[in-house]
Amino acid sequence: VAMAWPGPMDWEHMEITEADLEALLNRFLEDPLPRTDEELARILIRQRLQEIEERRRAALAGTRPFRPRDRYEVGERLFFPHMGFAVGTVVGIREGHNPEIGPFKVIQVRFEEDGTVREFAAEYPLPHRLNDLDGWRGPDEKELRPEAIWDRWGQRIREQLRARLEASPDFVQVGDHWFPRALLVELHEGHLNLVEAVLDVHNGGPLSPEELLPHLELPADVPLPLRVFSLNAALYRDPRFDEVGPAGQFLWFLRRMEPLEVQETPPRLQGRPYGGDRARLDEALRRIAAEIDDELSDPEEIRPGLGEADEVIWVASYPHLRSGTAPLTRRTGQVFPLGRTHRIRFEFEDPVSGRRWPGWVVRERKYVFGLKEWYEAYQVQPGCLVAFRRSPEPGVLRVTLRGRSRRDWVRVVRAEEGQLVFEMLRRQIPGEFDDQSLIVVDDPAALEELWTRWRNRPVRALAQQLLPSLARLTPQGTVHARTLYQAVNLLIRTPPEPLFEEMMSLPGCLYLGDGYWRWREEEA
């Protein structure tokens, strides 16, 4: 026995309408606090449910829900949630007969849809599932509960709402929060100039919006979250300011006072990202390339959400040692602070000396800056194992060398007659190292002069020039892929994959497998 009835929403195909956005604007007028898109999506779900209930109440005006436990009178109009919300009138009442149940009534109801009369128990003394219905939802409409809707369709609704908010000129986004543009606290040019002056006095920053607000004298009757949001929104629009806080934290810095290496990629790191097909390399070379942690190996942007690691060990490479940087890759990004912005300011800590100093994650160019003095203080060489470890204190990253300093026979490189020459010599190494990667540079200035001549030349030409000298260091005349990568990057910036591909077709070079090549002078 059915009737025309406002049924449940089709949440699977729900579309966000202008009326929805207008309703959210009105909600902000009632409660002027910034909200996340999840909070707004949940508000929207509750609003849609309220609309369904209001339509049902209107359709059922003058009726009451049928529940077996209730008492009814002849002439009362009832609706039945378990029967598609059919409506009928009580036309008769009689005593019920069942000794096992006890006294109860039986009501006769004539349904308005087709005039049929059916009987139902009333004043029923035992528990019954229909007594538990809230009246406006049927027994199969659990999806009309906000949490059930969110669990099943919440992410889809949230994504749709976010897309509509991003396209709407009426809303402003700061971080993961939203607020109507028309309700923002007004900040004029004088306020922004004052922020610039405050940051200038603090060496460019970083300062939080809460630290900046006392200097601006915004209306005190405006809630603090709205003042913070409005200030952040104004600073985002002004190119003088850079938001450099890690995820979940807003910190502002004067862009003109950021280190040059944060604003521009250091020359030693400039190279072409790899965009080829790794299938041309065997499994061993693909594994070695992945383990090298070269930021140019992966052309995709590094984003938050990589997971977290307490510690990451990186095998140092010469371009980063010269630049005072470390690579930002999918692996190292698990320990470095990441956020929604392209530049993130944090602090390095040397647990040996206790010293702290500024560090910068430069996410769009995939490196971390701020290590030059530390590298020089410990005389870190290409191939040394550098450990980055999270500190219990937020925004602090500890950097150390693995192991103790020791003297050993190692590869040493020097410049001679415009070329690099390698030999095995005893040198003091500041910590543990990867034997296949270690190359000690005694005279960085001499290599710098060679770098200016080689930096734009083909990788193939440099590899061919380096191989004979490297091969003479082993009795077998072999060169490992890690060794060659470190050697070539002394003068030419390249990720490992294109270098390995060139090696596979280089005359005089025989690939033995497992990452080893043998140099054969007679075939070169």
Where is each model-derived feature located?
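Basic/aromatic-rich interaction segments and small domains that mediate binding to polyanionic partners
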Residues: 23-31, 91-124
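Glycine- and charge-enriched low-complexity intrinsically disordered segments
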Residues: 109-141, 414-483
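Intrinsically disordered, low-complexity, charged/polar segments
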Residues: 6-18, 22, 113-158
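Mixed-charge, Lys/Arg-rich low-complexity intrinsically disordered regions
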Residues: 5, 11, 23-78, 135-150
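Short coil-to-beta transition motif at edge beta-strands of beta-rich domains
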Residues: 65-91, 215, 343, 384-385
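Charged low-complexity interaction tracts in eukaryotic proteins
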Residues: 162-193, 223-283, 498-524
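Positively charged, polyanion-binding regions of nucleic-acid-associated proteins
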Residues: 181-210, 215-219, 234-236, 448-478, ...
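Short beta-strand-centered aromatic/proline hotspots
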Residues: 85-98, 398-402
